[in-house]
């Protein structure tokens, strides 16, 4: 996995990103009740959706991911919705069904161990319940070019 802290182009750093792939439950939406959006998620997706594709994927399926985006009025910033379907021999989710160049995509997930090691994955702490003091998306915001102040 690439480091979330590398911002300069050069050997060993990630290429320009044109797609962001976010897990839904536990990453953007609380996983216990599904009723709260993680602090900063709206600002982050709004920012990313201006210049990049933003995809949501979920073990609950693409329709489920879409319904969560609509629930929180995020659907205007999202390009596509996909299921997390199938795993490889090592138990990691397959990404071949996603319309992304995995070398130019960033995956954001609270279960980074479920993704292949050759992907750029930004791990976030699990968002379990509504918490207005949560800072779980800060590293993602920094990678996306947002300051902490812009995230709130």
Question: What are the residue ranges of the model-derived segments?
Answer:
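Non-catalytic pre-domain segments flanking phosphatase-related domains
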Residues: 1-22
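Conserved phosphate-coupling serine/threonine residues in phosphotransfer and NTP-handling enzymes
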Residues: 58-60
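Short, acidic loop-to-helix structural element flanking the phosphoryl-transfer center
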Residues: 30-55, 85-92
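Metal-dependent nucleic-acid phosphoesterase active-site entry motif
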Residues: 20-31
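C-terminal cap/substrate-recognition subdomain and adjoining C-terminal extension
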Residues: 66-152
């Amino acid at each position: 996995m690439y480091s979330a802290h590398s911002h300069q182009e050069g050997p060993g750093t990630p290429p320009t990103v044109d797609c962001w792939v976010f897990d839904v439950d536990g990453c953007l939406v609380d996983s216990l009740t599904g009723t709260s959006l993680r602090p900063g998620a709206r600002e982050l997706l709004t920012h990313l959706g201006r210049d990049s594709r933003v995809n949501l994927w979920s073990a609950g399926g693409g329709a489920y991911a879409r319904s969560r985006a609509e629930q929180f009025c995020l659907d205007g910033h999202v390009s596509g919705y996909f299921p997390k379907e199938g795993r490889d021999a090592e138990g990691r989710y397959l990404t071949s069904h996603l319309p992304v160049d995995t070398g130019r995509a960033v995956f954001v997930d609270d279960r980074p161990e479920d993704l292949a090691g050759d992907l750029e994955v930004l791990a976030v702490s699990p968002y379990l319940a509504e918490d207005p003091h949560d800072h779980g998306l800060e590293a993602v915001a920094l990678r996306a070019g947002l300051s902490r102040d812009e995230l709130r």
